[in-house]
Amino acid sequence: MRKFTTILAVLCVALGFACCSTSDSEESVAKQYIDATFTVELSDLGTRSAGKATMIDKVEYGIYDVADGGRLLAPISSKELGAIDFDESKAVIDVRLAAGKKYDLVFFAYSSKSNAYSVDWENRLLNVSYKNTATGKNDLANLESRDAFFHVEQDFLASTGKTFVLNRPLAQLNAGQSYSDFANMLGNKIIKSSLTTQAYTQMSLGRDTYGNVLGSKSDVVFELNDVVDVDDTEGNDDLVVKVADAEGNAVDTPYKHLSMNYLLVNSKELVNVEITMLGDEGTLFTRNYPNIPLERNYRTNIIGNLISSPFEFEIVVNPIFTNDHNQAQK
């Protein structure tokens, strides 16, 4: 009986040690990882009107191990590497990351209603198509769904509570008709427009090269489509441009939207632009604008009496932001 008691005591001690060892091991492993939560938001947080990120509803992200040659990691938690719904231009992402390690994070936000963009996550490349991939034909003009945003964060140390602001890799090109010109049309209005210009089809998302476009510009044709405010009678979808008044102050000035399109450009570009506009009486108006400046994450606005005085127009480039994040990546 005494011998049995001794064996039982030793067994209990051994089991207790094993339990403690398992607990310590689990605690040690837990300390090696951080359950990181960070927020992704869009830089364009203004009113939800045309040209204001109204259709962005998905964000994809890639996580790369810097110490392991930038290797793309497999999904790290219950959330898969893929699309997460946006809510009020924000998305919250939860991932488990190793404590003390550096990561590169790549985010790309887009509209689920467009197939204009694809990301090669292994090679960290953004590919842009100006065709309708379903039909193989040129895409339509004035599609808000072609809007997109990105951000690359290098050498991120696992932490929580971080907010990343995404900016457009695109320039927004607009044409706006003055209200006096609109009045001169005596009730007629422009209902459709098309665009012919040049833009790039690929951009790097790579380490130290992100934001660099690749290759040469390609010809881009966006086919005739409804203008963004064709059914608007209250001015809600006006093109609002900051124009200098007589004292040199920038004043918000409304124009009738005739054209709005997104183009992948280098940090700054000069392109030739042709806009064809269809009036509701069936008349076509074609306007050519040479050497128009485009700038990534900015709005280039061609404004004036574009119908009655085709050779009298103004080019105004406004920052695309409505908040304090007034810096485009590269």
For the regions a protein language model found, what residue spans apply to each?
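Bacterial Sec-dependent N-terminal signal peptides
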Residues: 1-31
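Extracytoplasmic cysteine-anchoring/structural motifs
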Residues: 20-330
